[in-house]
């Protein structure tokens, strides 16, 4: 049953838009015996978990409101990466971490008629893994999930800044890269970029002096020049010279 339900989720999601994921994830959860299944996505500052709801859905109860990361079982599941359970009237609610690689996205909230046994928990864990993969894959194709992660307005400079950033966390058996930008709604100028390839990991930090649109433009231009040089196979010194030349002639 689990494999069939997950295969159906993968098939249905192939041509799905970001706003359709909520319904698909819930449908898969029902096929696995859940009453409701809701993905919660963390905001940029990782303070709250916001529910991903189908278009037009209303907050039917407090469980579908934003959840505090530091004060709820859902938040504990997010922080510890371990499933959590709580008894509720007429059933049980399980919280499972949504993780893609090492990127923590949020949690999966699952309402069940009875406490899950080991097999059921294993099935829900597989659903959480599939949901996390879909969230990462579908986010760039719409604003639904992007808006969900924002609790404040991003100005032009910050929007430009975020558009050039790679994923802020990555890990393999050989290397781990992690970064955070603050104040996250007013970033403009500080940029990280990295590349993990066979036998080599390259990490670069850039600081566009000042703070504002001009600083963000400078940082974005610098990253583009850096990637162009790096992907052309230049040495570290030649990359530096190439980026410097691009800045002198291009800005």
Locations of regions flagged by a protein language model:
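… and, occasionally, acidic/histidine-rich disordered N-termini of signaling adaptors
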Residues: 145-251
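Signal-transmission linkers at sensory-effector interfaces
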Residues: 1-15, 137
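A short, aliphatic-rich beta-strand micro-motif
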Residues: 84-100, 106-108
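Amphipathic alpha-helical "output/dimerization" segments
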Residues: 116-136, 221-224
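Flexible loop/coil segments at beta-strand boundaries within sensory signal-transduction domains
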Residues: 45, 98-104, 196-197
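Short beta-strand-to-loop transition segments that serve as allosteric relay/switch motifs
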Residues: 106-116, 208-209
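Amphipathic coiled-coil signal-coupling helices
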Residues: 134, 138-145
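Structured interaction and signal-relay segments at domain junctions
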Residues: 13, 21-82
